[in-house]
Regions:
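Sec-dependent, cleavable N-terminal signal peptides
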Residues: 1-36
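Primary mode marks residue(s) on the alpha4-beta5-alpha5 output face of response regulator receiver
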Residues: 37-68, 72-174, 181-281
Length: 281
């Protein structure tokens, strides 16, 4: 009996180990799925030239901000704290297609105390989930994104700054909420999807991502990467965010979204909608 017991014990242990390994694989698979939150379908994308750096935030009242920090502005060329939707619609814009009228802004950043100057902004509007359920972003939507990641040159996206990056440029990418309450344009009316879909009472809108392209000052990205916050403070990179004043409801933009985004992911994209090369994302 002792001999039998000695033979059965390893078998039992092997069974336990195999079960534990299976659980780990399932957990790992779930983590990989969660990391793929931003996977999107067909995309309409364009670029915007850098406009200016200023203490500007038209959303300061909605966000409860008392001390406006320095932001880098793209898109609408005359953005002020007092700007209006009408001003954006009628004003000059630095983005590629003439029908783009939105404004985009984000805090400036430094690495090891040296300012990193923005080269340009890339903007992406993408389909996701069941594209037949997507609705247009409401005119005047005030979108606030705090979900950021980083890329060094053509390298893969990562969740933390790519310190030591020696490419000519690095990017900070910000992802925006993709679910709308249907009840106005205040930043609180837009929330992130959960478990691959919008919560009850929310409608899915195109998934938006912006990528700010920066010159790699000094030829290498050094610690610490800090961003402007408050009146004259610089904070940890985790304070990074971006804002969009979305006024793109004119015919040209609507047509681009319907042609490039509001369609099944398994249909071919028109050439004008195709994503650029990987190192441009």
């Amino acid at each position: 009996m002792v001999a039998v017991t000695r033979l059965q014990l390893p078998v039992a242990l092997i069974g336990i180990l195999l079960a534990s390994l299976l659980l780990l694989l399932v957990a790992f698979s779930g983590a990989r799925t969660a990391d793929a939150t931003h996977r999107s379908g067909n995309t309409f994308q364009f670029g915007c030239d850098f406009v200016k750096t200023d203490r500007i935030d038209p959303f300061k009242d909605e966000l409860g901000i008392t001390h406006v920090h320095r932001h880098e502005v793209f898109g609408y060329r005359n953005l002020q704290n007092s700007s209006t939707v009408t001003a954006l619609l009628n004003g000059a814009n630095s983005c590629g297609p003439s029908f783009v009228k939105a404004a985009y802004w984000n805090p400036l950043n430094t690495d090891a105390g040296t300012r990193n100057m923005p080269r340009r902004l890339s903007v992406y509007y993408s389909g996701w989930g069941d594209v037949n359920k997507l609705v247009h972003i409401p005119r005047g939507a005030k979108l606030y994104g705090t979900d950021e990641d980083f890329r060094c040159g053509a390298g893969q996206a990562r969740q933390t700054p790519p310190y030591g990056c020696k490419a000519d440029e690095f990017r900070i990418r910000v992802h925006f909420p993709e679910c709308w309450s249907g009840n106005g344009v205040h930043p609180r009316e837009f929330v992130e999807a959960n478990s691959g879909g919008c919560a009850s009472g929310y409608e899915p809108i195109p998934r938006i991502r912006v990528a700010v392209h920066y010159r790699n000052s000094g030829g290498i990205l050094r610690k610490p990467l800090r961003v402007s916050a408050g009146a004259d403070r610089m904070e940890n990179w985790s304070f990074m965010h971006a804002d969009i004043w979305e006024v793109n409801r004119q015919a040209g933009f609507r047509n681009a979204i319907e042609r490039c985004v509001f369609k099944s992911q398994n249909t071919g994209e028109p050439h004008t909608c195709s994503p650029p090369a990987s190192n441009q994302l």
